[in-house]
């Protein structure tokens, strides 16, 4: 059993679907449509068609659809998600073309999420995009954090998120 979510291109056309498992013990947490001529996971970001119009001068980059949906519901309309754990070079370049001043990496607080944050810093830097890293305590991901502590607490995390060098030095 999965919650199915449409994946849109920049113009708002549905190009694929993503499914998130409802059971925590499911073998694959997320499943996407097969790749096609119009849908390549490495070339797209979930909700970029909405976030590109945000008045915020940054994107919040996270891992999952539910994180993005939760953030948008809480008023963080610049949230986007990779269509896999880590950002790709193509996605980093796409972000760079969107005209935002920086990206706040808000990956899951587990080991793979933190590894993806380090990789993201490097790829975004190569694309000419400044990165900051949001670090959560008390929750595994942005969705859980917002549900437990609220939107104001998440806004404080965004404001206090450290630069890439601070993050790498603090590991």
Give the predicted meaning of each segment.
Residues 66, 87, 107-117, 139-140:
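Acidic, metal-coordinating catalytic cores used for nucleic-acid/nucleotide bond scission
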Residues 116-127:
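Conserved acidic, small-residue-rich alpha-beta core segments centered on
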Residues 92-97, 122-124, 159, 163:
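Flexible glycine/proline-rich, aromatic-decorated loop/lid segments
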Residues 1-102, 117:
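Phosphate-handling DNA/RNA-contact segment within nucleic-acid enzymes
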Residues 61, 100-112, 134-135:
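Acidic beta-strand-to-loop metal/phosphate-binding motif
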Residues 130-171:
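C-terminal or mid-to-C-terminal helical accessory/interaction module adjacent to the motor/catalytic core
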Residues 95, 126-133:
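Long, amphipathic alpha-helical "stalk/connector" segments that mediate intersubunit docking
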Residues 97-99, 121-123, 148-155:
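Short, hinge-like loop/turn segments at secondary-structure boundaries
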């Amino acid at each position: 059993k999965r919650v199915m979510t449409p994946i849109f291109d920049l113009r708002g056309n549905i190009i694929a679907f993503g499914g998130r498992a409802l059971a925590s013990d499911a073998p694959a947490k997320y499943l996407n449509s097969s790749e096609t001529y119009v849908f390549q996971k490495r070339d797209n970001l979930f909700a970029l068609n909405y976030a590109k119009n945000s008045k915020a001068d940054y994107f919040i980059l996270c891992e999952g659809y539910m994180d993005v949906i939760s953030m948008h519901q809480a008023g963080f309309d610049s949230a986007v998600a990779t269509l896999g754990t880590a950002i790709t070079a193509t996605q980093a370049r796409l972000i760079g073309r969107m005209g935002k001043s920086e990206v706040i990496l808000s990956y899951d607080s587990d080991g793979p999420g933190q590894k993806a944050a380090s990789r993201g810093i490097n790829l975004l830097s190569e694309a000419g995009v400044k990165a900051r890293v949001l670090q959560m305590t008390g929750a595994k991901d942005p969705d859980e954090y917002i549900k437990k502590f609220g939107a104001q607490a998440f806004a404080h995390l965004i404001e206090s998120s450290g630069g890439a060098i601070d993050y790498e030095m603090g590991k």
